[in-house]
Amino acid sequence: MEKKIRIGICGYGNLGHGVELAVNRAADMELVGVFSRRDLPGTDSGVPAINLKHVLDYKDKIDVMILCGGSATDLVDQGPELAQNFVTVDSFDTHPRIPEHFANMDAVTKANNTAAIISVGWDPGLFSLLRVLGDSVLPEGKSYTFWGKGVSQGHSDAIRRIPGVKNGKQYTIPKQEYLDAVRSGKGTDAPGNEMHLRECFVVPE
């Protein structure tokens, strides 16, 4: 391509590293830099690591800023702030707060003539679309959602932000009795939080 989409990454945790890999494999994109509140020693791909306080110096050098911070505290502040000057994409996944996040981002982008896509990814995102498709072809059916067994990045991030916690991981595990009930056709009226076990492993400071 003659002109590639110029990408910036804000946040350099697990998600930021993953986005860096994906952008570098996309023929129509080029990574301009990685922005962080920390002073990073460098990046895996060799692109500049830039302190977030200098982000406005890149306003005309980046077409899309991909926000890779945590939903618990980062994106609610960084999203509206960065959307004043950049087109942004985020993976905000605190489901009950998505309408609030949408309203905040919508107001900022309209006021500043920018654009933002929120809650992009697997869940919410593609997983949400799959549920809609399922409900559309089986209108008399009932959808159940199970997560895991696996690490929840969002919940793990929330654990690590608790004072006194040095490190932590949270595993989301479907409860077998609910899996069996759904698979057998009996179903259940239990809410999603009852159908899962959230197992936390914490290292204190």
Q: What positions do the PLM features span?
A:
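Hydrophobic/small residue at the entry helix of a nucleotide-binding pocket
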Residues: 15
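NAD(P)-binding Rossmann-fold cofactor-contacting core
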Residues: 25-45
